[in-house]
């Protein structure tokens, strides 16, 4: 997604990436390289960090020194907060893209300081429970009502809560498709047979699809920019599948 966006909007970008040294971080880095294709030389620096590191400041300093004008942060919430603060503290002004796993307003951007997060880009597939633009959305109204009734101690602005509700709806759909045949084989077969399923919490245009040879239900995201105290989506829903 990010590679596709940069190729279209900033084809001369010099990209630096910070990622956690685990399978997810390495997969994201590989996906970026694959997405850039023959333009992979746009990636000028990449640094991994260990989850046990108390601070990632030294990595940010190294990435800035690379001459990069575009910074992609594929980090956990704690490190994302540190990265946003450090970039602002150094006066570095790259095009800043924050991985969606740590794009929560409540747990990342607010602790990092809204003033430091202005203009940061990300991409996501779900509606933000903290964003008033969804207050009259029928799907989100059902989500809010569910929380009020069954989980009043949970925050609708918590990205993991939004994710959990949508994932639970997808599981209900799988079990509904399975009918009375709740064997493991049939449940797995139905999980690999989702067709254009739309949970209440996904952005308009995003649909869940799986097949026997494609187990990734969500392969679409929409770019968004942080403005004021909320995310503002822009542009079309983008497919992350290579070749599309």
Language-model regions, residue ranges each:
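Extracellular/periplasmic Venus flytrap/periplasmic-binding protein
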Residues: 1-91, 133-134, 138
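Short amphipathic alpha-helical coupling segments at ligand-binding clamshell hinges
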Residues: 139-143, 167, 182-190
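Buried hydrophobic packing segments
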Residues: 2, 6, 167-175
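Extracellular/periplasmic periplasmic-binding protein-like sensory domains
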Residues: 87-163, 237-242
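Short hydrophobic alpha-helix segments
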Residues: 46-47, 235-237
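Extracellular/periplasmic catalytic domains that process cell-envelope and extracellular macromolecules
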Residues: 9-10, 64-66, 89-91, 112-116, ...
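Conserved beta-strand scaffold positions in the cores of enzyme catalytic domains, especially
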Residues: 43-48, 120-122, 223
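Segments of small-molecule ligand-sensing domains
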Residues: 149-162, 172-233
């Amino acid at each position: 997604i990010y590679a596709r966006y940069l190729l279209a909007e900033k084809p001369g970008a010099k990209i630096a990436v910070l990622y956690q040294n685990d399978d997810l971080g390495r997969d994201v880095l590989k996906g970026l390289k694959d997405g850039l294709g023959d333009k992979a030389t746009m990636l000028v620096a990449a640094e991994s960090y260990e989850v046990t590191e108390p601070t990632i400041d030294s990595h940010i300093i190294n990435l800035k020194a690379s001459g990069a004008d575009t910074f992609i942060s594929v980090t956990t919430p704690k490190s994302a907060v540190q990265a946003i603060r450090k970039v602002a503290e150094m006066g570095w002004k790259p095009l800043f893209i924050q991985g969606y796993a740590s794009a929560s307003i409540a747990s990342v951007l607010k602790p990092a300081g809204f003033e430091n997060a202005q203009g940061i880009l990300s991409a996501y597939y779900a509606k933000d429970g903290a964003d008033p633009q969804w207050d009259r959305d029928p799907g989100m109204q059902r989500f809010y009502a569910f929380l009020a009734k069954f989980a009043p101690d949970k925050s609708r602005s918590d990205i993991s809560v939004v994710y959990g509700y949508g994932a639970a709806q997808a599981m209900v759909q799988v079990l509904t498709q399975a009918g009375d045949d709740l064997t493991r084989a049939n449940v797995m077969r139905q999980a690999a047979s989702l067709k254009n399923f739309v949970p209440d919490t996904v952005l308009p245009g995003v649909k869940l699809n799986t097949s026997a040879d494609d187990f990734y239900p969500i392969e679409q995201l929409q770019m968004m920019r942080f403005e004021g105290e909320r995310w503002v989506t822009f542009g079309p829903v983008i497919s992350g599948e290579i070749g599309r």
